[in-house]
């Protein structure tokens, strides 16, 4: 028996543990949870004739011959889980006042909430990685609980993924005389819409701003474009708004995720992404596959947090959040990804 109801867990999860990474916030504002295990693209408003190309991955290799186009898709299922160890409730928590120790019941509540925070963060990192990969490459590999890895390909045009080479590398240009504006305008022509924002990783930004022409043209004053400033303000410590370059906002993203205990950057070194803040990114979710959720009438949901105790000798208590995320772009060609060199 849990001391928290699902509604309480959902409320606590949403209010206290909201993770707000850049790509999800800027480009993936629509959310579509489904009551079915599969996500049906035909049921998303305005998404006419969109299909994904899906291919199984065996031993790290994409098996194209076994892939195919589909308008219905089964997302990977993720469910990070923790045990609430009774021994932990007997020890002082790191931020506890030694002169005013809390009781074990209070510590248990704190541990449960910390577990839920960690589980939410784990899922949010999966979502952001899917979102970043969709924008950067137009595809990503989806994995999940007891789920064979599958590549999800949204059909990005080859010319929208650019690698500087053959003398076009910015690192080889004269920083005092060369103006990279023409390059950016040429790259932007590949986008299916208007480009109003450029996102750099820190190293890509350092290379870009090393040009004298950039320093002269970059407008760092506020008030240049109120709509864009609203879109990119208050994005957290991993994001820095650098100013306007003509009518394009410049943002630097240093967001990280944790893989096998090691921090890694979401954006590869020397990355530049051209896009539009009105691009239609879709957060879709398959149904929650849990008998308790079904009994509570929760099927279509981005999250299902639960806290329960199994009887026995001894009894054991657990926390878990379940989700079946699939981040999609209605038009993957709204973005142009450039690997700077």
UniProtKB/Swiss-Prot annotation:
UniProt-listed HAMAP family: CAPSID_LAMBDA
One Pfam entry name: Phage_cap_E
Coiled coil: none
Species in which this protein is naturally found: Escherichia phage lambda
One GO CC term, this protein: host cell cytoplasm
Keywords assigned by UniProt, alphabetized: Capsid protein, Host cytoplasm, Late protein, T=7 icosahedral capsid protein, Virion
Compartments, record wording: Virion; Host cytoplasm
Major location category of this protein: virion
Subunit relationships: Homomultimer. Interacts with FI protein.
Name of the featured protein: Major capsid protein
Family the entry assigns: Belongs to the lambda phage major capsid protein family.
Superkingdom, taxonomy of origin: Viruses
Job description of the protein: Assembles to form an icosahedral capsid with a T=7 symmetry. The icosahedral capsid is about 60 nm in diameter and composed of 415 major capsid proteins. The assembly is primed by the interaction between capsid assembly protease and portal dodecamer, and major capsid proteins assemble cooperatively to form the procapsid with the help of capsid scaffolding protein. Major capsid protein forms hexons and pentons of the icosahedron. Viral genomic DNA is packaged into the procapsid through the portal vertex.
